[in-house]
Each structure stands twice: as C-alpha cells, then as structure tokens.
C-alpha cells in the first residue's frame, strides 16, 4: 500500500480485503527482519519478532519464512495480554543444519506490565528412524526433518510437574 517493497516501514494489505495492516520491520539480507499485522478486531500478530522465529535461506542473511512469535491485544498500557511462541530452529543464520523449524513452547498470558507468563505448553520431539526422514530442497537449500512430535505437556510455570501430558505415537 505504501513504502518501498521489502524495506522497513513498507505497509501491505491482504489480497482479499481483511482490513488488516501489515508492516515490515527492520532488515535481514534482501528483505525485512519481521512483520507486524494489526487486525480490525484489535489483535496484533508479530512474525519473525525473535531470532528463533526467523527461518533463514541456507547460509544467507535473507529470511525465507517468518514464524509467528507473539500475539497480543491492543488494550491500553498495563492491561494488554500476550501469547509468546518459541521455536527449535536449525535454520538460523550462522547455524544452518537441517533447515528445520518446529515449535518448542507457547507461553501465556503475559501482561503489558511484564507479569507472567503463568502457563506454558511444551512440545518434545524424538529422532525419527533414518529411513523415515523426509528430505528435500527449498529455494536450493537442504531441508531435512529428522524429528517427530513425541509429547505435549501443559505446565504451570514454576510447578514441579505438568498439569497434563499427552504422549504421542
């Protein structure tokens, strides 16, 4: 909609109008470091807002995917809430190995005053048998996913044991 495509401050809209405002932030290689999406209902989505939520294109400083790093509401100072996502990332600049990127945890809620988070959902993975590892290339870069989701645990932060654990497989 405005600004120079791919640079900090550029403003975008969705192809089918949703009345969301998308703003590019910072710079990483040949594009933005992150994006902020503000929706008409007051939610603010941050993509690539943390190092672990940026998926790099091989050894390049250019990002090939921006994962959701935070969701927050637009409430006034001191009253807003947020959900924070963290990732296991083997596609970070300077440490590109398998090119894989997978969710590690989701923490919630965090308030605008910094209180919390109080709860966390943790994701645990195991290594797949070598014969079952999907391998491919994306934009000329190796992408192997040797991991499979093994367990999901819901935790009160600071508690010794999870509230609930789901074993998969």
Give short role names for the model-derived ranges.
Residues 1-169:
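Conserved catalytic cores of ATP-dependent inositol ring kinases
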């Amino acid at each position: 909609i405005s600004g120079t495509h791919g640079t900090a401050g550029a403003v975008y809209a969705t192809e089918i109008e949703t009345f969301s405002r998308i703003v590019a932030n910072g710079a990483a290689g040949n594009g933005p470091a992150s994006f902020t999406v503000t929706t008409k209902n007051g939610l603010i989505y941050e993509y690539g807002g943390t190092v672990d939520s940026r998926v790099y294109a091989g050894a390049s400083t250019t990002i090939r995917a921006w994962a959701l790093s935070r969701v927050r509401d637009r409430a006034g100072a001191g009253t807003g809430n947020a959900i924070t996502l963290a990732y296991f990332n083997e596609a970070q600049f300077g440490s590109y190995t398998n090119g894989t990127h997978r969710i590690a945890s989701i923490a919630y809620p965090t308030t605008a005053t910094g209180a919390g988070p109080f709860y966390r959902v943790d994701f645990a993975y195991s290594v797949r048998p070598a014969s079952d590892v999907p391998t491919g290339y994306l934009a000329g870069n190796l992408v192997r996913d040797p991991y499979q989701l093994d367990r999901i645990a819901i935790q009160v932060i600071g508690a010794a044991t999870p509230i609930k654990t789901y074993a998969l497989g």
